[in-house]
UniProtKB/Swiss-Prot annotation:
Residues 113-270 form the Integrase catalytic domain. InterPro entries: Integrase_cat-core (IPR001584), Integrase_H2C2 (IPR041588), Retrovirus_Pol_polyprotein (IPR050951), RNaseH-like_sf (IPR012337), RNaseH_sf (IPR036397). The gene is GIN1. GO terms for molecular function: nucleic acid binding. GO terms for biological process: DNA integration. It holds the Pfam family Integrase_H2C2. The lineage of its organism: Eukaryota, Metazoa, Chordata, Craniata, Vertebrata. This is Gypsy retrotransposon integrase-like protein 1. It comes from the Eukaryota. It comes from Bos taurus.
Length: 499
């Protein structure tokens, strides 16, 4: 048990100072020297690694995380830098770095808010359908997110020029919106934006669905998609002639949560509709096409409402049962540390198709050294033997490799011999001990500089001597060349003298 001083604090700093230097700390009182000498006999710094290894590794072969390892260490041992030492030990564990799989979390999505009619619309493509008499095969559906107003137009194909012409025709009727959200690849959206800029003068009005998150209930209703698919099968030759009637019938019948139709939401009034008998009776007992479409859409709405009600009741019952049996605990999502990798950093690379070999196969291979960075952002690596890998690796498939503090001294000379003869395209090389703190973000606090890990005066002198000897070898390549040429000249003179 370590005695406390007059102020009640432990003499850990004084004991460590006496243990390393053999002298008393300047703040040590004369009355405390005997207690510090006795306590220093019980302190053995070499046992710290043994304690960390025993607490980190389980008897079954499993490796604990930071919190569990720290709990086990603090239950039986104590020293001043126990938290930082545990973090450094866990992050530098070879088994944990290679065996731990990456957990990629989707970024937090913010729902898009729409406050005005015809400000933000979505565009969906449907088809291919049966070729109509006018050679139409596809259909484009434009839906206003605020009013749910729907416009449907036929298309001959799904090229960027054909879609742009259809969008321009809708612009001439209702005006251009602020944004158009489309679920297509970025290259195709770029082509549509170029076509719209040439035809109408708008720039970057169409955006990707991935860049903006919308509520699924605000997108194109599934009712109209289901109805349109069935209607095109029932009328394979003239389905494109009925698209204006389908969109109008949907806009005047589909009720919103506000109990208003999309037509009323769009124009702030209801359209003039003739009597139902006038709509249905045309030329005697024949029913008009619009009346058939209107009845079919109403039936489809009723079916969807019944399905939604039944599904909602089942979900509520399931949630109620789960709430009774379980207590939901809200957990904070894990945060990924963004890595800033540069030339000279030691990294682990992700194994290609590692999941096909079984879940017990390690995901990461290494360590490797970043030789240089290509113009496309790929990293060319060298393995531990100094051989360069054939293909560049994406930065997203790399993560920093953390070594123990004792391994960094011998590793620095290896890095110099491997990468000193190469002209870098990317950033200049860095010493091994210095780059670990710059790779990781500040919140992680797992990279520690060599000067912070080496606390004794002898270790600091060794570090300064090592940096003083290595830095000329890493930086001044011209000096090495001059020395080499001077040795060659002297050897040539000796050979001439002998001959």
């Amino acid at each position: 048990m370590v005695r406390s001083g007059k102020n009640g604090d432990l003499h850990l700093k004084q004991i460590a100072y006496y243990k390393r230097t053999g002298e008393y700390h300047p703040t040590t009182l004369p009355s405390e020297r005997s207690g510090i000498r006795r306590a220093a006999k019980k302190f053995v710094f070499k046992e710290k690694k043994k304690v960390l290894r025993e607490c980190h590794e389980n008897d079954t072969g499993a490796h604990h995380g930071i919190s569990r390892t720290l709990t086990l260490v603090e239950s039986s041992y104590y020293w001043t830098s126990v938290t930082n030492d545990v973090k450094q030990w866990v992050y530098a564990c070879q088994h944990c770095q290679v065996a731990k799989n990456t957990v990629i979390l989707a970024p937090k999505q913010h729902l898009l808010k729409v406050e005005n009619p015809w400000s933000i619309v979505t565009v969906d493509l449907m088809g291919p359908f049966h070729t109509s008499n006018r050679s139409h095969v596809y259909a484009i559906i434009m839906t206003d997110l605020f009013t749910k107003w729907v416009v449907i137009l036929p298309l001959c194909d799904v090229s960027a020029s054909e879609i742009s012409k259809a969008i321009i025709n809708i612009f001439f009727l209702y005006g251009p919106p602020q944004k158009i959200i489309m679920d297509q690849r970025d290259e195709f959206i770029h082509q549509i934006n170029v076509e719209l800029c040439e035809l109408f003068g708008t720039k970057q009005i169409v955006i990707s669905h991935a860049s903006q998150t919308i509520n699924p209930a605000e997108s194109t209703p599934s009712t109209i998609k289901t109805f349109l698919s069935k209607h095109c099968v029932d009328y394979p030759n003239d389905w494109d002639d009925h698209l204006p009637a389908v969109s109008f019938a949907f806009n005047v019948t589909h009720l919103e949560p506000t109990k208003n139709t999309p037509y009323f939401q769009m124009f702030n009034r209801n359209p003039y509709m003739p009597e139902s008998s006038d709509i249905r009776e045309v030329d005697g007992d024949n029913t008009s096409m619009f009346a058939k479409i209107l009845d079919a859409i109403k039936e489809a709405d009723k079916i969807m409402e019944n399905k939604t009600t039944s599904v909602g009741q089942m979900e509520n019952n399931n949630c109620h049962e789960l709430n009774k049996s379980k207590i939901i605990v809200k957990k904070k999502p894990k945060q990924q540390n963004p890595f800033h990798l540069k030339v000279g950093h030691e990294v682990l690379r992700q194994r290609k198709n590692w999941w096909k070999d079984g879940r017990f196969r390690s995901e990461w291979v290494g360590p490797c050294v970043i030789d240089y960075i290509t113009e496309n952002g790929g990293a060319v690596l060298r393995d531990s033997s100094g051989a360069r890998l054939k293909r560049p690796i994406k930065m997203s498939h790399l993560k920093p490799y953390v070594r123990e503090s004792g391994e960094q001294d011998s590793l620095h000379l290896l890095h110099g011999s491997v990468v000193a003869d190469h002209d870098y395209v990317g950033m200049p090389e860095l010493p091994v001990g210095a780059y670990q703190a710059s790779i990781l973000v500040e919140d992680a606090a797992i990279g520690v500089d060599d000067s912070e890990l080496l606390t004794s005066s002898k270790d600091r002198e060794l570090l300064e001597y090592r940096n003083a000897k290595i830095s000329p070898l890493m930086e001044d390549h011209n000096a090495l060349e001059k020395q080499t040429f001077s040795l060659l000249d002297s050897s040539n003179q000796v050979l001439e003298y002998l001959t």
